[in-house]
């Protein structure tokens, strides 16, 4: 199947350290070589800053504008070649795009051909915000009735599930719901889809990161006091204390632990966890 990587933070942070190890699994240290993708939510004032992997610098900006536009911008990269060899993936490994919510995916095709339109993460608009979704699993006999504007472009079970999730969210809420209200609805939708097969997924609208576990999904919270971390898939390590301050908090979610010396917490099958500002809130 596939592998997932997500990041949720309380301040814009780059994911170059984590993505470097993750991308090696896309055809080098593992066999997920059928495409990859990554999406970064950004506020109006964010951009690319000079820095080291997973640094946490924030540009000066107007607070009112930031609150209004926080996380509404999106940078989205996909490629149907392997992440371990893709020049675009190499760009992401070296380009410190800062974001509070990131979703990445490396694909091992089970349904749908190897093609650009079948690469995760997928993107849709709802309530004036972008929504990003990536899935690891294999859904069988899942054929929901779709209507309205949410329809898949490619031929994967994953994008079909995403279209259904978006449709049901729109049907369930007359106005723009809160993160807590969305979490309740998403638990109901996930419980409806999960009987069709493994349904590990990451979902974000730029305000929160939702992670649903079916088989394998882990998370780690990085906060003060920060320590060293060493990647499993590359001979790379970092001292986070050199690139952070005491208020920074970062949650990383992944299919299999990326580092060998951090405490990765396994999520329970059927569990939907929501992260806001780098910590679990529900």
Annotated model-derived regions:
Residues 1-83, 270-272, 278-282:
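Extreme N-terminus nucleophile/cap motif
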Residues 2, 131-141:
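Conserved beta-strand-loop-short alpha-helix elements that form
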Residues 80-92, 106-128, 145-148:
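Short acidic (Asp/Glu) patches
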Residues 101, 176-215:
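Catalytic core of PPM/PP2C metal-dependent serine/threonine phosphatase domains
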Residues 139, 204, 270:
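Glycine-rich phosphate/ribose-binding loops and adjacent secondary-structure elements
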Residues 141-143, 147-172:
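Glycine-rich phosphate-binding loop plus the immediately following alpha-helix
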Residues 154-157, 215-238:
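Gly/Ser/Thr-rich active-site loops/lids in small-molecule metabolic enzymes
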Residues 228-271:
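A conserved acidic, glycine/proline-rich C-terminal tail/linker
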